[in-house]
UniProtKB/Swiss-Prot annotation:
It is linked to A chromosomal aberration involving POU2AF1/OBF1 may be a cause of a form of B-cell leukemia. Translocation t(3;11)(q27;q23) with BCL6. Ubiquitinated; mediated by SIAH1 or SIAH2 and leading to its subsequent proteasomal degradation. It comes from Homo sapiens (Human). Its main location: nucleus. This is POU domain class 2-associating factor 1. It is found in: Nucleus.
Length: 256
């Protein structure tokens, strides 16, 4: 008895897929090989479709020169540049002609002809760490080596034709005295100041008695002064009047 395997149902044919080109393992090398083959045969290269992996539905065609042909184009450019450089003729060096001297203006007076008061030697005298005096020796308190020395003035090629200007007199040459000690080692001032006078002994304030008027006492003293000014007769009359009033008052009280 023979056992037969059940035959599987026939699978339906798969639907037709669009043409996706030829799959190659190394598409870049394949392109280079095909281009070299077309270049050697002399035929115009037809646009080829190369399918890269992981792109099953997209087709690409090479349009224009690729970046792989840049080496050949660069070498061709260098050869053309060398060829063009051979065509250009190098210019011959021209000889330089000396310029004629300019004619000076008749009314121009050079500034060297007028002596400037600041053309003398300038000196520097540090006064404090943040202040320094710069000026001629007449301004400073002592002479030191100059900072800027104007020894001579520039001589003009052509003398001035205009009338000379009246400038200040030239200063006499100054003599320089070297100052070996720096400012930090200068001795201190030799002036001696007198000590302040000692304080006076005893209290400096004098106590004066001050009398404060008392208005109550004055009111009490005023009747006494008025009584002393009255005569004895007037006093007797006033006392009699006061006694009679007191007597009448007592009588009226007793009678009541």
């Amino acid at each position: 008895m023979l056992w037969q395997k059940p035959t599987a149902p026939e699978q339906a044919p798969a639907p037709a897929r669009p043409y996706q080109g030829v799959r190659v393992k190394e598409p870049v090398k394949e392109l280079l090989r095909r281009k070299r083959g077309h270049a050697s045969s002399g035929a115009a290269p037809a646009p080829t479709a190369v399918v890269l992996p992981h792109q099953p539905l997209a087709t690409y065609t090479t349009v224009g020169p690729s970046c792989l042909d840049m080496e050949g184009s660069v070498s061709a450019v260098t050869e053309e540049a060398a060829l063009c450089a051979g065509w250009l003729s190098q210019p011959t060096p021209a000889t330089l002609q000396p310029l004629a001297p300019w004619t000076p203006y008749t009314e121009y007076v050079p500034h060297e002809a007028v002596s400037c008061p600041y053309s003398a030697d300038m000196y520097v005298q540090p006064v404090c760490p943040s202040y320094t005096v710069v000026g001629p020796s007449s301004v400073l308190t002592y002479a030191s080596p100059p900072l800027i020395t104007n020894v001579t003035t520039r001589s003009s090629a052509t003398p001035a034709v205009g009338p000379p200007l009246e400038g200040p007199e030239h200063q006499a040459p100054l003599t320089y005295f070297p100052w070996p000690q720096p400012l930090s080692t200068l001795p201190t001032s030799t002036l001696q100041y007198q000590p302040p006078a000692p304080a006076l002994p005893g209290p400096q304030f004098v106590q004066l008695p001050i009398s404060i008027p008392e208005p109550v006492l004055q009111d009490m003293e005023d009747p006494r002064r008025a009584a002393s000014s009255l005569t004895i007769d007037k006093l007797l009359l006033e006392e009699e009047d006061s006694d009679a009033y007191a007597l009448n008052h007592t009588l009226s009280v007793e009678g009541f």
